[in-house]
Structures are given as structure tokens and as C-alpha cells.
């Protein structure tokens, strides 16, 4: 059964938060009681994603395996490919008071991201994001709902003519979202603060082999389509051969406290954002575990507000946001929802799904 959406408002925020944290408390014996770092013991993590179930990405001990596509018959309802990524992280930078202006949480992989990848690709309940379909919306536990049409977040078949993009905010160093989800979109832009980008680029390049369904071009990563060796007297380029479609993948600095898309002069500072507008008909903004203290909430929501206005008015894009939260502080979660709904006037849906409710995470769809 597909997930449902609970439309939150200024009254149901508190009911939702109370219920979710009550569920969490009831599962305290089953769930890890930690801050959510995927693995704080190692500098290099080996993680496997495969369609055998939601296992959160099994960690390997520095044994590198390359991507191998499953022999299971292709099914657009769930992904069938397996992915194996190597993530270099920096525990020392996480605890540093000097690195990246003392904003250091992005130097390690947090568990929200692997959980989201597993759920999106392999959970049957996440099918609306893979197929593009109507989803039932309720306005509360006892309220009869309506249906909301969702565009595809990812296209497993490659047959959809629509051009879709993903803009990732607060990517951190791992780079696993672009190299996995990049297989199923046309444009992917991964952003974070400037001090994070070099390690993010390194991890993307390390795992570029996981882009098995796409040819990747990137200005920021200096990737161009290769030229095929001449055959006989003919010069044949890769672009002229029938093969994989192309992914535009970019890595860019985006400071939530400094972005100003209302000033047209600053648009030239963000060519990667313009790339999404110029190449896509729909965009999902993805932000995993970026709301963990109250000081980040306003800059994040202001950035979303600007992006929504600019991409919709300038390029007429379908605009949706997926926010993943590791449920730590109940006060921070409540404040985020209050500000998003009441102060910034976003439409916010809780994604109601059993797999998610049995975890320490929650996902919100924002429009």
C-alpha cells in the first residue's frame, strides 16, 4: 500500500508531533539511542544498497565491491539494481572548532540519508515518488481526505519524456544521493557550504561507477562526454551513439544566510540553479537531516521560499520539497513545523507510512 499524506495546519501540528514522539518512545527498546551518525568508528565506510529489504545500508569493513545490476526482471514499481558506495568521512573535522567556520556536521554521513535511499528505491509504499501518481491526503486522523497528484521524483524506466531535476540542500560530504538517484533524473545539483565541497566532490568521483544508467557531464567535476575511437574512416563520438541518456551533475556552494535570488545581479553567481530551470519541467528539493537545531530553521525556510518563487515564476517548474528529519528534539521539530506552516505559509504534509513510523526518522513533503 502506498504512503498517505497528512495535511498539517497550525492546529494539527501539535497532534502530529505528540503522536510521532509517542510512537518513538514506544519503540525505544528497538531503535538505536544515538545522535544518528552512520558509523563514527571509521574514516571510510562501505555501504550496500540492495532490493532485499530496508536494512539501512549494510556496512562493510573496507572491502570494495563494484556495482552489479540485479538479474531480476525490470519492474517500474521498485528498483532492482544494487549499489555499493565508499564514503570517506572525517571524524576529526566533526569535532573541530576550526574547520568550515565551526559548522562541521556535514563532515560525516548521517543515517537519515541511507534510510531514505532504501525507502525510496525499494519500499513498495514509496511507489508514488517512482511512478508519479495520486496520493490520498487526510486533514487529520478522523478527516476524510482528497487526492494529490505527485510528479515522479525518479524515473526507473527511462521512458518518461518529462525532464526532472533534484536540488539537494545541505548535502554533506557523502555524495551518495547524487551517484544513486542520479541514475533516474536528468539534472542533479548538490549543494552545501564552500568548506564541504572538496570532500563532497572526492566522494562523488570515488563512486561515479554507480551511475550505471547515465552518462555524466559536469562543469564543476570537469566531466565531459568521452570520444569513441575512430572506426574505419569515420569519427564517431559518444553523443552520436545510441546509448545511455545524459545526467547533468553539478556541485555548488549555497549559503542559506547569504542567498538572495530577488536580486537579479546575483543570479549569475548560481548558474547551477539556472541549469535546473533551463533543463527541467519539475524539481524536487531534497534536504536530509539539515534541521537539528533552532538556528538553522529560518535560513533554511527563507532559502526554500526564494527557490520556490524564483523557479516557479522564472521557469514555471513544478516545485516540491522533501525534508528528512532525524527525530531528536521534539521542540526543534515543533518549531520547524510552526515556522514552515504559520510564518512562511508553506503547505506541509506528513508522509504517513509504516516503515517510516517504525524508524527514528520522519519525512515531510512541502509545496
Swiss-Prot record:
Coiled coil: none
Keyword Methyltransferase: yes
Biased composition (Basic residues): 58-68
Xref: InterPro entries: Methyltransf_16 (IPR019410), SAM-dependent_MTases_sf (IPR029063)
EC number(s) given by UniProt: 2.1.1.-
Binding site for S-adenosyl-L-methionine: 110, 170-172, 192, 256, 288
GO BP field: methylation
A single Gene Ontology CC term: cytosol
Keywords: Methyltransferase, S-adenosyl-L-methionine, Transferase
GO MF term list: S-adenosylmethionine-dependent methyltransferase activity
UniProt-annotated stretches for the region Disordered: 55-74
Purpose: S-adenosyl-L-methionine-dependent protein-lysine N-methyltransferase that monomethylates 60S ribosomal protein L1 (RPL1A and RPL1B) at 'Lys-46'.
Protein family membership: Belongs to the class I-like SAM-binding methyltransferase superfamily. RKM5 family.
Name assigned to this protein: Ribosomal lysine N-methyltransferase 5
Originating organism: Saccharomyces cerevisiae (strain Lalvin EC1118 / Prise de mousse)
Lineage of origin: Eukaryota, Fungi, Dikarya, Ascomycota, Saccharomycotina
Amino acid at each position: 500500500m502506498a504512503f498517505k499524506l497528512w495535511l498539517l495546519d497550525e492546529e494539527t501540528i501539535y497532534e502530529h508531533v505528540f503522536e510521532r514522539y509517542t510512537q518513538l518512545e514506544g519503540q525505544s527498546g528497538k531503535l538505536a539511542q544515538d545522535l544518528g551518525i552512520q558509523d563514527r568508528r571509521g574514516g571510510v565506510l562501505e555501504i550496500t544498497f540492495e532490493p532485499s529489504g530496508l536494512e539501512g545500508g549494510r556496512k562493510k569493513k573496507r572491502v570494495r565491491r563494484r556495482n552489479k545490476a540485479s538479474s531480476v526482471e525490470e519492474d517500474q514499481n521498485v528498483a532492482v539494481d544494487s549499489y555499493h558506495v565508499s564514503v570517506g568521512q572525517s571524524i576529526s573535522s566533526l569535532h573541530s572548532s576550526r574547520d568550515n567556520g565551526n559548522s562541521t556536521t556535514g563532515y560525516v554521513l548521517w543515517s537519515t540519508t541511507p534510510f531514505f535511499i532504501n525507502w525510496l528505491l525499494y519500499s513498495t509504499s514509496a511507489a508514488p515518488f517512482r511512478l508519479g501518481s495520486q496520493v490520498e491526503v487526510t486533514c487529520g486522523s478522523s478527516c476524510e481526505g482528497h487526492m494529490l497528484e505527485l510528479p515522479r521524483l525518479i524515473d526507473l524506466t527511462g521512458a518518461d519524456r518529462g525532464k526532472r531535476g533534484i536540488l539537494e540542500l545541505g548535502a554533506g560530504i557523502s555524495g551518495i544521493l547524487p551517484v544513486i538517484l542520479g541514475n533516474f533524473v536528468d539534472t542533479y545539483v548538490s549543494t552545501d557550504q564552500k568548506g564541504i565541497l572538496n570532500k563532497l566532490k572526492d566522494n562523488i568521483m570515488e563512486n561515479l561507477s554507480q551511475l550505471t544508467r547515465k552518462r555524466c557531464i559536469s562543469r564543476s567535476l570537469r566531466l565531459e562526454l568521452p570520444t569513441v575511437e575512430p572506426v574505419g574512416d569515420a569519427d564517431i563520438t559518444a553523443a552520436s551513439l545510441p546509448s545511455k541518456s545524459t545526467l547533468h551533475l553539478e556541485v555548488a556552494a549555497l549559503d542559506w544566510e547569504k542567498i538572495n535570488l530577488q536580486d537579479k545581479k546575483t543570479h549569475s553567481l548560481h548558474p547551477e540553479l539556472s541549469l535546473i530551470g533551463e533543463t527541467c519541467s519539475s524539481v524536487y528539493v531534497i534536504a536530509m537531516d539539515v534541521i537539528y537545531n533552532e538556528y538553522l530553521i529560518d535560513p533554511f525556510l527563507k532559502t526554500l521560499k526564494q527557490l520556490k518563487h524564483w523557479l516557479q515564476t522564472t521557469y514555471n517548474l513544478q516545485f516540491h520539497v522533501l525534508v528528512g528529519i532525524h527525530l531528536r528534539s521534539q521542540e526543534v521539530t515543533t518549531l520547524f513545523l510552526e515556522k514552515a506552516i504559520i510564518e512562511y505559509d508553506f503547505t506541509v504534509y506528513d508522509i504517513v507510512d509504516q516503515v517510516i513510523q517504525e524508524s527514528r526518522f520522519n519525512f515531510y513533503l512541502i509545496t
